[in-house]
């Protein structure tokens, strides 16, 4: 329950702060685009520390081998950023000029990093490998923040490119679990924060 309350409180403050900066935000659009990330945050918070989550992690590690480690997740989270600027270089039509893209990218990452690290220290959840500050996953938050910037920039002109960032961010989250660095709930909440905050920034 404390995970849910912390997530809701922090994200609510973020929502209010961003919403006050613009009178042109379409409230209906915000609600529609918030359904998925809020669901991820809520469900992730509910299953955090549950027997289901622990059994899932145990079964996953048994399937890949307890000594398995493939640190591709340390690199995949940057791919959406590379996609964004490569698309600009080759002349792909986007919603905003590269300068504004960079502005939204930085604002989104600063906000999501603050929220994620704030929750990490407030919650103090242990990682499946015995480490600390597990909830939520910063790698996943960062990856989904960047992927959501790509989505917002290219969804109207190039849907395939817009959705491609989520392929890399999802893979990042999966490998955080495969490498025994995070639980499912850490990944779900991290993804939800990245998507929600970035959509609010846009």
Residue ranges and their predicted role:
Residues 98-103, 128-131:
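Short acidic, glycine/Ser/Thr-rich loop/turn "cap" segments at secondary-structure junctions
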Residues 84, 105-124, 162-174:
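Small-polar-interrupted transmembrane alpha-helices in polytopic inner-membrane proteins
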Residues 126-202:
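Membrane-embedded catalytic cores of phosphoryl/pyrophosphoryl-handling enzymes
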Residues 14, 48, 87, 116-124, ...:
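Membrane-water interface at transmembrane helix exits
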């Amino acid at each position: 329950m404390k995970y849910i309350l912390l997530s809701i409180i922090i994200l609510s403050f973020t929502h209010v702060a961003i919403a006050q900066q613009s009178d042109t935000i379409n409230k209906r659009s915000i609600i529609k685009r918030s359904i998925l990330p809020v669901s991820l945050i809520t469900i992730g918070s509910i299953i955090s520390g549950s027997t289901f989550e622990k059994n899932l992690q145990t079964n996953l590690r048994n399937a890949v081998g307890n000594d398995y480690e493939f640190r591709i997740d340390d690199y995949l989270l940057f791919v959406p950023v590379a996609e964004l600027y490569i698309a600009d270089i080759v002349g792909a039509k986007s919603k905003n000029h590269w300068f504004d893209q960079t502005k939204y990218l930085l604002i989104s990452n600063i906000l999501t990093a603050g929220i994620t690290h704030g929750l990490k220290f407030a919650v103090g959840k242990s990682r499946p490998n015995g480490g600390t500050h597990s909830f939520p996953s910063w790698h996943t938050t960062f990856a989904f923040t960047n992927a959501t910037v790509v989505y917002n920039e290219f969804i109207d002109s190039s849907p395939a490119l817009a959705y491609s960032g989520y392929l890399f961010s999802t893979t990042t989250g999966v490998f955080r679990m495969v490498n025994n660095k995070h639980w499912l709930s850490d990944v779900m909440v991290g993804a939800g924060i990245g998507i929600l905050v970035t959509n609010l920034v846009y």
